[in-house]
């Protein structure tokens, strides 16, 4: 096989379809709770703070399990690793539907954090192994990173408009949504089981040594990308977990209307995630990130200060936050210290640090919303975080501009 053939293996898009299916279902299960927050709080007797703690449960586990999951992906391979992750995510969805109180509800959501890292680290490793051409690789990153958002968007739309009226039960709704992962597992089992050997090398070239965890952490560029991941997750999980409730309680929308407007924001994020990474050259990554952060800050602040009738526009602007994830993932994959043989470890470390933001986002916003500041104060806090993230984004220029000068 020539180098060109290796970069364009005919099976790469078939395998990629299976990855996208699992990642889509990942988003469905992850987002199964936020549209139903009101019903679940009433049924289980949870305060906003307790619900925020539960929403961040799987991110707490991610902090510990992500490095382990990354190493498992490197050792088990993407076929078995992603399959194992999908099984655990399915179990999480079923167990959360059977919760009877805060403790069991928290544990059920936390279980998601055990299987999730295998999926989230397996997807970029597969892209690194099967997509050698830079533009195709960036396109693949943009596509698969939108799958959780699309899955979450579908959950937002169908939970209150179709499934809740059909079943009359938040528990049955969660079970049905978990069934999407069962279907995705079946597809992945078939397409990955028939896959040939990946065209890209999974071991370092002869005479070189794979960069391990210590080597990755010694890279200042890698550490900067870790910091960006923390901020992106704080914003993404914080707004993703609470935005439907913000529009219901702060702006006065119905549950269905709130879910639909949040889904619109998700659609904006999906389009941006597909377009921006592919068209953004490495030296322009900081500029693209800065523009998105400013837009998100303006959007969430506008929900607080502008008339409610303009909220859909503000929510759409805030939806651009989804495009930050693929941009940061591109920066991670193109870091000097990251290579195919250590992709799992690198992404495991990244998710471990990033999910600190994923944990604190829903928790902090929930706590702030429980105070006299309400959801307005919580949204202004998100805007402040966006502004603060402009500092590490600016520092990233020294790495992207360095590559431009080579």
Question: What are these model-derived regions, one by one?
Answer:
Residues 33-34, 221-263, 270-273:
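Extracytoplasmic gate region of multi-pass secondary transporters
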Residues 64-100:
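Conserved MFS/SLC helix-loop-helix module at the cytosolic interface between two early adjacent transmembrane helices
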């Amino acid at each position: 096989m020539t180098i060109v053939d290796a970069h364009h293996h005919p099976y790469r898009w078939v395998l990629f379809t299976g990855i996208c299916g699992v990642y889509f279902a990942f988003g469905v299960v992850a987002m199964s709770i936020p549209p139903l927050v009101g019903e679940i709080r009433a049924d289980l007797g949870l305060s906003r703070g307790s619900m925020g703690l539960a929403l961040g449960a799987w991110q707490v586990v991610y902090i510990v399990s992500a490095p382990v999951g990354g190493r498992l992906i490197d050792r088990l391979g993407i076929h078995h690793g992603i399959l194992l992750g999908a099984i655990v995510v399915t179990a999480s969805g079923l167990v959360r539907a059977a919760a009877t109180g805060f403790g069991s509800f928290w544990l059920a959501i936390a279980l998601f954090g055990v299987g999730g890292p295998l999926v989230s680290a397996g997807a970029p490793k597969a892209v690194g192994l099967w997509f050698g051409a830079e533009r195709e690789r960036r396109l693949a990153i943009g596509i698969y990173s939108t799958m959780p958002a699309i899955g979450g968007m579908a959950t937002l739309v169908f939970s209150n408009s179709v499934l809740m009226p059909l079943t009359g039960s938040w528990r049955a709704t969660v079970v049905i949504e978990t069934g999407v992962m069962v279907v995705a597992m079946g597809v992945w089992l078939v397409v990955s089981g028939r896959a040939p050997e990946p065209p890209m090398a999974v071991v370092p070239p002869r005479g070189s040594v794979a960069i391990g965890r210590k080597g990755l952490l010694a890279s200042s560029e890698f550490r900067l990308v870790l910091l960006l991941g923390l901020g992106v997750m704080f914003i993404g999980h914080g707004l993703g977990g609470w935005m439907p409730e913000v529009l219901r309680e702060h702006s006065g929308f119905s549950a269905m209307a709130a879910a639909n407007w949040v889904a619109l924001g998700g659609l904006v994020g999906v389009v941006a995630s597909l377009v921006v990474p592919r068209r953004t050259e490495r030296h322009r990554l900081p500029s693209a990130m800065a523009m998105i952060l400013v837009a998100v800050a303006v959007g969430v602040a506008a929900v607080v200060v502008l008339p409610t009738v303009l909220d859909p526009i503000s929510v759409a602007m805030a939806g651009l936050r989804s495009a930050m994830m693929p941009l940061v993932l591109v920066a991670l994959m193109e870091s000097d210290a990251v290579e195919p043989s250590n992709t799992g470890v690198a992404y495991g470390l990244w998710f471990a640090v990033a999910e600190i933001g994923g944990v604190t986002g829903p928790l902090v916003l929930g706590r702030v919303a429980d105070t006299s500041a309400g959801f307005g104060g919580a949204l202004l806090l998100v805007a402040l975080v966006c502004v603060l993230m402009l500092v590490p984004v600016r520092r990233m220029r020294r790495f992207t501009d360095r590559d431009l000068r080579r």
